[in-house]
Amino acid sequence: MLTENYNKQAIAQAFGRAAGCYDRFAELQRTSGERLLALMPAHSGLQVLDAGCGTGHFSRYWRQAGRNVTALDLSAEMLAYAREQHAADRYLEGDIENLPLADSCVDICYSNLAVQWCDSLPRALGELYRITRPGGVIAFATLADGSLSELSQAWQRLDGTQRTNRFLPHSVIDAACQPYRHHLLQEREVCLFPDVLALMKSLKGIGATWLHEGRTPGLLSRARLAALSACYPQEQGGYPLSYQLVYGVIYRD
């Protein structure tokens, strides 16, 4: 079994390799991030933490809205890219499950598609709650069980292997939120690709080819890709990849 530190290092490296091309492939991240913003209650607080900021796309949104933004990410390469874009006011390399921040130091915690990579969702939410001031708000978007189901089915048909990440069921995400006043919403988002190669590139382009079990999918030969394509379900003339998105808003009492 791989250690937690090794897992976190591998995840950071996977996203670090994607830093330069992340925004070109990050349609899902933008869609979920904008939806999360729409679900958040209005809040006048000035201090914002973008937890798992990636390239800083939404850090920039908050900064342009007049907030003082701390961009935090596990990947030094992602942070460097965000810094180049002048996305935030402050940049922190760190782990959501062990935030290098004082208690009650921000008004808003915003985390778009990051906590699914954490080892313990309750610990991650507890840390975000800890650093948020009373009266503040924590908003997160994450992936739930059933995400990448078409790709998972294709691999199962091809060779019987599990080559996609497993995500938490909605019930487990809900249980992690129970200590707090909160509300959750689950929605399905489907991305359609012209071929399986483009689909796989989209995952690699956003750094999401890391597997929780410590395995990596490896390179696909042309023959292997053709075989996977033959096993992949088609829809509307394309290759679908669905995501089960869970949006959560927690109120800091």
From Swiss-Prot:
<dbReference type="GO" id="GO:0009102">
    <property type="term" value="P:biotin biosynthetic process"/>
</dbReference>
<comment type="similarity">
    <text>Belongs to the methyltransferase superfamily.</text>
</comment>
<keyword id="KW-0489">Methyltransferase</keyword>
<dbReference type="GO" id="GO:0032259">
    <property type="term" value="P:methylation"/>
</dbReference>
<comment type="function">
    <text>Converts the free carboxyl group of a malonyl-thioester to its methyl ester by transfer of a methyl group from S-adenosyl-L-methionine (SAM). It allows to synthesize pimeloyl-ACP via the fatty acid synthetic pathway.</text>
</comment>
<dbReference type="GO" id="GO:0008757">
    <property type="term" value="F:S-adenosylmethionine-dependent methyltransferase activity"/>
</dbReference>
<dbReference type="InterPro" id="IPR011814">
    <property type="entry name" value="BioC"/>
</dbReference>
<keyword id="KW-0949">S-adenosyl-L-methionine</keyword>
<keyword id="KW-0808">Transferase</keyword>
<comment type="pathway">
    <text>Cofactor biosynthesis; biotin biosynthesis.</text>
</comment>
<dbReference type="GO" id="GO:0010340">
    <property type="term" value="F:carboxyl-O-methyltransferase activity"/>
</dbReference>
<dbReference type="GO" id="GO:0102130">
    <property type="term" value="F:malonyl-CoA methyltransferase activity"/>
</dbReference>
<protein>
    <recommendedName>
        <fullName>Malonyl-[acyl-carrier protein] O-methyltransferase</fullName>
        <ecNumber>2.1.1.197</ecNumber>
    </recommendedName>
</protein>
<dbReference type="InterPro" id="IPR029063">
    <property type="entry name" value="SAM-dependent_MTases_sf"/>
</dbReference>
<dbReference type="InterPro" id="IPR013216">
    <property type="entry name" value="Methyltransf_11"/>
</dbReference>
<dbReference type="Pfam" id="PF08241">
    <property type="entry name" value="Methyltransf_11"/>
</dbReference>
<keyword id="KW-0093">Biotin biosynthesis</keyword>
